[in-house]
Amino acid sequence: MKAFLGVEFQLVCCAYFLSYKTLRIFLAALSGFMYFRMNNLHKEDMNFKKIVAVDETLLNEAALEQLKTIGEEVVVYHDFPTEEEEVIRRIGNADCLLVSFRTPIRRSVLDACPNIRYIGMCCTLYYPESSNVDVIEARKRGITVLGVKDYGDEGVVEYVVSELVRLLHGFGNVRWLEESTELTGRKVGIIGLGKTGGMVAEAMRFFGAEVLYYSRTRKPEAEAKGIAYRPLADLLTEAEIICTCLPRNNYLLGEPEFALMGDRKILVNTSVGPTFEVDALKKWLGTCKHSYYLCDATGMGVVRDALKDIPNVLYTPYISGKSIQSVERLSQKALANIRTFLSEVPQV
């Protein structure tokens, strides 16, 4: 009897142990399944259904490949749509839109493409009011709009230096004055002392120029380096070389301003699009035969046809801020913005 009870007790213990072990295995399996399921649901939530690069955003191939890991469908265009209907057709039901500074994304586009929840501007977003995207309307609809900054400034500064040196020394087809001259000792006025303007100012100082600046707000840190503030009228009168480094759609120079400049001046534009009234610039260049306007494809913008044949317009038909390095910086920052949006982690 004792032996039987001993065996029975052992069997009960064994059954209990097996049940407990089975339960543990079951719970472990269930936990693993739930983790896998929740993780995949999280990944689904973290991805876009459809990403559309609606025009030539300049993202490099590595970045375009990365888009495939965060979008179930990725459509990339390498040209610029000329009609709004084409913009709408390209975007379609996309929930992620990538766009350069050239293609307008108006309220009517947002109306026609209601699935958009993120707009990645592959360019600098200075102010909502000056953007090619209706940022204010987009944000009213809960659409996140993020831009990229500080990616092409180095190339722009190199362009300014190289074109000024060519003109001052006559290394190209024309020379500013009768004799070759250096930047050393020349008065250079910077209008807009943001990132690009500040870098141009530092480059001019390196070459020994006397640098003046005008900005909506005073820059004590720049003034501490010897970059002198001037009211706009004084800067236009005093400076021999004037460089506009302004946000898009800032038209600061009209006939009164050009009258203050007079002859034997050089105007360089690093901004996106003109910073002047076109007719006023044409009148100034027509009257002041020893003055020049320098710009690249970005600075010329939509006024190219009106200015390209004027002899003292020195136009470079390339984007000075575009280089291997700037495209890489642009691509990485555009991707970082997307990941920031998807993860909802503030960007440091």
Task: Describe each PLM feature range.
Residues E8, F17-K21, I25-L30, Y35-A94, ...:
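N-terminal glycine-/charge-rich "phosphate-binding" loop or analogous flexible N-terminal tail
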Residues C13-C14:
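Cysteine-centered motifs
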Residues K43-F48, D55, A63-Q66, R139, ...:
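C-terminal helix-to-coil terminal segments
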Residues F48, T184-K187, R264:
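Phosphate-coordination loops involved in phosphoryl transfer and adenosine-cofactor binding
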Residues G92-D95, P104-V109, R218-A306:
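Rossmann-like adenosine-cofactor binding region
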Residues A94-R175:
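Phosphate/diphosphate ligand-binding glycine-rich loop within oxidoreductases
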Residues G170-E202:
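Glycine-rich NAD(P)-binding loop of Rossmann-like domains
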Residues F206-E223:
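NAD(P)-binding Rossmann-fold cofactor-contacting core
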